[in-house]
Each structure stands twice: as C-alpha cells, then as structure tokens.
Amino acid sequence: MTRVKRGYIARRRRTKIRLFASTFRGAHSRLTRTSTQQKMRALVSTHRDRGRQKRDFRRLWITRINAVTHENRVSYSYSRLIHDLYKKQLLLNRKILAQIAISNRNCLYTICNESIK
C-alpha cells in the first residue's frame, strides 16, 4: 500500500474544533471526541433557538401591549386593538407597538382612540 502524506490536516481539524469548544467547561473543551459531540449539540441548539427566539419576542411584545391596553380601559383588550388597527389600516407591527407602549403610553392611548373611531 502506498503511503499517503496528509501533512497536518487532522491536527488542523482538531484545532478548529478545540477553538470552537474552548469556552466549554471540563472535558468538553479538552477531549477531542467529547468536544466534537458538544460542538454538534451546540450547533443544533443554536439552530433550534433561532426559531424559538422569534416566538419568544413576539409573545413578549403581545404581553406588553396587552398590559398597557388593560391599564387604559378595562374592557379593551389586545385582540380588539389589533383588530381595530387592521380595520383602520394603521400598519404598525407588534414590535413597534410594544416600544411605544414602554416609552410613551400616551401615544399608545391616542393610537387606541384613533382605531376605535
């Protein structure tokens, strides 16, 4: 069998994995096999959580808007506000509405009143 001269390919691959796993704790940052497995798990988690992050922020925005609208009037709810905004064709997304709710509640109250009229 002929000899294959690969140079430092394997060492370069392991070094890349070690650099990725350098912030992991314990054997996950030192041993090649466990660091490879942890790298795969970390990449799976980041891929999954990128989608989950979008859902979590949307839930947070909805909660903030709903809290401010309930302070304004007891009978007014988040779902009715969004429905009225769509009817009036006021195109404000939930992120912007949540920022307005935090920074300037009076502005959100005027938006609510405009959507009712």
Swiss-Prot record:
Biological role: Binds directly to 23S ribosomal RNA and is necessary for the in vitro assembly process of the 50S ribosomal subunit. It is not involved in the protein synthesizing functions of that subunit.
GO biological process: ribosomal large subunit assembly; translation
Species classification: Eukaryota, Viridiplantae, Streptophyta, Embryophyta, Tracheophyta
Gene3D superfamilies: 6.10.160.10, Ribosomal protein L20
InterPro entries: Ribosomal_bL20, RIBOSOMAL_L20_CS, Ribosomal_protein_bL20_C
A GO CC term assigned to this protein in UniProt: ribonucleoprotein complex
SUPFAM superfamilies in the cross-refs: Ribosomal protein L20
Compartments in which it is found: Plastid, Chloroplast
PROSITE patterns in the record: RIBOSOMAL_L20
GO molecular function: rRNA binding; structural constituent of ribosome
Predominant subcellular localization, coarse grouping: plastid
Transmembrane segments: none
Family: Belongs to the bacterial ribosomal protein bL20 family.
Protein name: Large ribosomal subunit protein bL20c
Keyword Nuclease tagged: no
Keywords: Chloroplast, Plastid, Ribonucleoprotein, Ribosomal protein, RNA-binding, rRNA-binding
Organism name: Ceratophyllum demersum
Domain of life according to the entry: Eukaryota
Any Pfam family matching the protein: Ribosomal_L20
